Amino acid sequence: MTNTVKLTEFINDNSNLRVLQGQECVAGKEITVSDVYRPGLELSGYFDFYPADRVQLLGRTEISYAARLDHDLRRKVFEKICQKETPCLLVSRNLPVPVELKEAAEAAGTPILISNDATTYLMSMITQYLAVKLAERSSVHGVLVEVFGMGVLLTGESGVGKSETALALVQHGHRLIADDRVDVYQRDHETVVGEAPRILKHLMEIRGIGIIDVLKLFGIGAIKDETEISLVINLTNWDSKANYDRLGFQENTRIICGIAVTQVTIPVKVGRNMENIVEVAVMNFRAKAMGFDAAKTFDENLTSLIAENSEEEKRG
């Protein structure tokens, strides 16, 4: 199913936009493409490959060029620009809208929006907004928290202690984004973002207590609507026979929305302070990203020590 954004929602979410003409047509319009188009060649009469299903943005360049056209040509061009599938026309900088454009838009049932903002700003702002709104979303089982400003997805089998660990992290001053189910989407080629489903927003389930409202119990500083997922921490029940990473050389990843995210596995055992371990895991991940790798330093020091001992044995 293709995601859509109703034009009414688009206008309400962006206070810098207002309807100049065609208010009665707004409710029936939907946006299905995140790209915004500036009709340039179309003003000269070239309409091959014209993407009529996009938001059409007209700035100072387009309006001034159209003003140089004769009346009949200007009318024909605007009639072709305004198609039934066109969600809306948007004019920047509060520029005067040509009469021919108003007539063509009215005939096609295309609303005209206007904004005081610059064209390039509107292009960037709208593209980013629509990219998020129209992104394909999927769900993963886990708890998403923000620790030291970094999005951490806690995963593991049911009952392993994900929610309890997240609650302890919130009490340490960190933030909850989503509990139990995390909706994820790809923001760009390198970024995956997680958020809570609307029905679960700010809520957490703690076994033995039930559903709690983190916002009301801990305040606005304890929650966040969404965050980029930078690290996955997989919590597993302690297995004495398992071969856990003791030095930190293993680098594993988990694919989320087609993006590889670093994953570490932490065994859960009675007596282990999981929130502190998660905090250390995040700090260690950030340190590695900055070029400080304790495991690598240890390996280099060990190799150097072995080499020195070998030289001493040869001399002895």
UniProtKB/Swiss-Prot annotation:
Keyword field contains Magnesium: yes
The protein's required cofactors: Mg(2+)
Region of interest (Important for the catalytic mechanism of both phosphorylation and dephosphorylation), residue spans: 204-213
Domain of life of the native organism: Bacteria
InterPro entries: HPr(Ser)_kin/Pase, Hpr_kin/Pase_C, Hpr_kin/Pase_Hpr_N, P-loop_NTPase, Ser_kin/Pase_Hpr-like_N_sf
Region described as Important for the catalytic mechanism of dephosphorylation: spans on this chain: 267-272
Catalyses which reaction(s): [HPr protein]-L-serine + ATP = [HPr protein]-O-phospho-L-serine + ADP + H(+); [HPr protein]-O-phospho-L-serine + phosphate + H(+) = [HPr protein]-L-serine + diphosphate
Residues where Mg(2+) binds: S163, E205
Residues annotated as the enzyme's active site: H141, K162, D180, R246
EC annotation from Swiss-Prot or TrEMBL: 2.7.11.-, 2.7.4.-
GO annotation terms (biological process): regulation of carbohydrate metabolic process
Entry binding sites for ATP: G156, E157, S158, G159, V160, G161, K162, S163
Key words, A-Z: ATP-binding, Carbohydrate metabolism, Kinase, Magnesium, Metal-binding, Multifunctional enzyme, Nucleotide-binding, Serine/threonine-protein kinase, Transferase
Record keyword Metal-binding present: yes
SUPFAM superfamilies assigned to the protein according to its UniProt record, in alphabetical order: HprK N-terminal domain-like, PEP carboxykinase-like
Molecular-function GO terms, alphabetical: ATP binding; magnesium ion binding; phosphorelay sensor kinase activity; protein serine/threonine kinase activity; protein serine/threonine/tyrosine kinase activity
Extra information: Both phosphorylation and phosphorolysis are carried out by the same active site and suggest a common mechanism for both reactions.
Family: Belongs to the HPrK/P family.
Domain characteristics, as noted in the entry: The Walker A ATP-binding motif also binds Pi and PPi.
Function field: Catalyzes the ATP- as well as the pyrophosphate-dependent phosphorylation of a specific serine residue in HPr, a phosphocarrier protein of the phosphoenolpyruvate-dependent sugar phosphotransferase system (PTS). HprK/P also catalyzes the pyrophosphate-producing, inorganic phosphate-dependent dephosphorylation (phosphorolysis) of seryl-phosphorylated HPr (P-Ser-HPr).
Oligomeric and partner information: Homohexamer.
Protein name, per record: HPr kinase/phosphorylase
Organism in which the protein naturally occurs: Lactobacillus delbrueckii subsp. bulgaricus (strain ATCC 11842 / DSM 20081 / BCRC 10696 / JCM 1002 / NBRC 13953 / NCIMB 11778 / NCTC 12712 / WDCM 00102 / Lb 14)
Lineage per the UniProt record: Bacteria, Bacillati, Bacillota, Bacilli, Lactobacillales
